[in-house]
């Protein structure tokens, strides 16, 4: 542990002995770079310094703070879990790993990280970075159940020394030394017993999985304006983008299908529209698919008809009110497209 004591990263959630803050940081760090997380974490802690402050909050407020961090189900599950802890466990985070692991959004990695760092319990926290280190350290090539069990067993042999620090030291090694496509073995405290380093082939391990091409989904969206305000609608709470606001849009086979856009706006929001012109296209990649969005400028023709918002919440907002609501990144690209078209 000499290496960790000397070279560990100075991160705002470390060395504070607060299970809530440790847990929050690990949730935010899933699939997200540390440098991206730091400002989000700091802003969150300023507004919600305790678990109870999260449990008592409005989800829309949490979602606004999370805006841009992506993987929004993390925020939703963290909120649900905090509410459960507040009602069922008197606001105290369970120190039993089985109970903690049963909370929404908590899996083996987060439970191992929180139990080891916050409660000093000897549980490995194995994410992609630590897996990569151990595959190289043990000279394992293929991602099989047998090899994963070997990694877990190996980690349990020395996790007792300083559980949280062991896990965090491996996180730091994976972040700065034993990277996916580049290694700095001369700096690594594990190198002298690392099988792939001793054989001179660390970058060949583990076997790389060929990335699948992201499927492209076509979407058509309507920019609807009235009295210098634009219409935004709220997605229902299901799905990866649940609870976020957006310009009205719908998945289509052909993203120039103007008839389908008209039909969608009529059936869902009781809006009769005519389409004036195409504003442009936006492409945005999420983790599992790409969005190809065609945006059309639309004009309401039944202006006296009340907007039907019984299915989804809807609002007319001015451009300077956009920052009050949480939008997904693809929608922010649409706002940029609108600004360019109006310039």
Residue ranges and their predicted role:
Residues 1-10, 15, 175-343:
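Intrinsically disordered, low-complexity, charged terminal extensions of DNA damage-control enzymes
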Residues 2-184, 190-199, 203, 270-272:
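Catalytic cores of DNA base-excision repair glycosylases
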